[in-house]
Amino acid sequence: MELLHSINDFNEAKQVIAGGVNSPVRAFKSVKGTPPFILKGKGAYLYDVDNNHYIDFVQSWGPLIFGHADEEIEENIINVLKKGTSFGAPTELETTLAKEIISCYEGLDKVRLVNSGTEATMSAIRLARAYSQKDDLIKFEGCYHGHSDSLLVKAGSGCATFGSPSSLGVPNDFSKHTLVARYNDLNSTEECFKKGDVGCVIIEPIAGNMGLVPAQKEFLLGLKALCEKYQAVLILDEVMSGFRASLSGSQEFYGVVPDLVTFGKVIGAGLPLACFGGRAEIMDLLSPIGGVYQAGTLSGNPLAVCAGLSALYKIKRDKTLYTRLNALAVRLTQGLQKSAQNYNIALETLNMGSMFGFFFNENAVRDFDDALKSDTEMFAKFHQKMLFKGVYLACSSFETGFICEPMTEEMIDLAISKADESFDEIINGV
């Protein structure tokens, strides 16, 4: 396999695009490689400009639960496209999508559509502060909630990839109201409550940006109780886990009903769309009926709404979808685990529905500190080996992988066999 055209394309991109990419992790910096420049995707496969193809376990970082270029979703988008791309005015499709989302999640009365997960979390926090009339926010080490200033504090994912706990350009005044607790640690969390006047707490119930690290059930239930005790708004960030881990996101596993929730990725099916929502008494504080301002030129645009609605309709029709995706994820993670054991390589694997993760780590990962103990050099070697064998994995050990509906057991078994070859070559210095 060669990447000559991709190398040339990347060099050209770096002349006109900052860093050569429009989102930092895509640069392959942490795996010391060159990113393949993608020509097209179809089903479970990606095709690059060098005529290579890959089994794609990234799926655009999660949105594509039905894989690339799904015919039904594409056809629906094209039909809507013929009527216009954006109107800046209400449409019936928006209301229909809102109803579909609300029907899947307990405690959700109303939603507001936005364009990105960052917008969703930023707006939810503003709303929560207005409702609680308290400024301080608790977040958790390793949880990523987008790149708004107050949330770029020990944010995992891209920050962990580049060895930085925060970001330049964020004034201290922006983050002084952000208190950081340890994930899966109630004592650490209550200490934060005692330190400040906490108005809201935001958490990924299934963290996907320090690798895949699910909350322990007793921790999430305890967090809900602490929020009630201290009269703070609980925000579950399900931008990644919503409609991915299950139809009801984390609620299938934990049964926790938040005050506010954020969704993204799957609800846009690959187009820019996210939302935040919650109890009516909180949501009704939003402008134009309340005093909390939030707006967006392209919010609820018909193309993205149509794509998301098409995906949700397909999900709801397919009663065994999540069972099949989970089975494939289990098959993959167990296969990787067994292969690593054959070469005495320390590897921890897990999945939550169609989300999966693995760490080159001797012990189970419960929080960000555990994740940082992983062997990132081993991950970089493994990633490059797999890439050149036609398996496209997330290019950071602090990211999550995804299964899509077009994948088959044969594809999973092929990926496992390529992992076995990769481990053999790494151990033998090939």
Curated annotation (Swiss-Prot):
It catalyses: (S)-4-amino-5-oxopentanoate = 5-aminolevulinate. The keyword Signal does not apply. Pfam families: Aminotran_3. The modification N6-(pyridoxal phosphate)lysine is found at residue 265. SUPFAM superfamilies: PLP-dependent transferases. InterPro entries: 4pyrrol_synth_GluAld_NH2Trfase, Aminotrans_3, Aminotrans_3_PPA_site, PyrdxlP-dep_Trfase, PyrdxlP-dep_Trfase_major, PyrdxlP-dep_Trfase_small. It is an enzyme of class 5 (isomerase). Keywords: Cytoplasm, Isomerase, Porphyrin biosynthesis, Pyridoxal phosphate. Its EC number is 5.4.3.8. One of its GO terms (molecular function) is glutamate-1-semialdehyde 2,1-aminomutase activity. Its cofactor is pyridoxal 5'-phosphate. Its main location: cytoplasm. GO terms for cellular component: cytoplasm. GO terms for biological process: protoporphyrinogen IX biosynthetic process. It comes from the Bacteria. Pathway: Porphyrin-containing compound metabolism; protoporphyrin-IX biosynthesis; 5-aminolevulinate from L-glutamyl-tRNA(Glu): step 2/2. The keyword Phosphoprotein does not apply. Belongs to the class-III pyridoxal-phosphate-dependent aminotransferase family. HemL subfamily. Homodimer. This is Glutamate-1-semialdehyde 2,1-aminomutase. It comes from Helicobacter pylori (strain J99 / ATCC 700824). The lineage of its organism: Bacteria, Pseudomonadati, Campylobacterota, Epsilonproteobacteria, Campylobacterales.
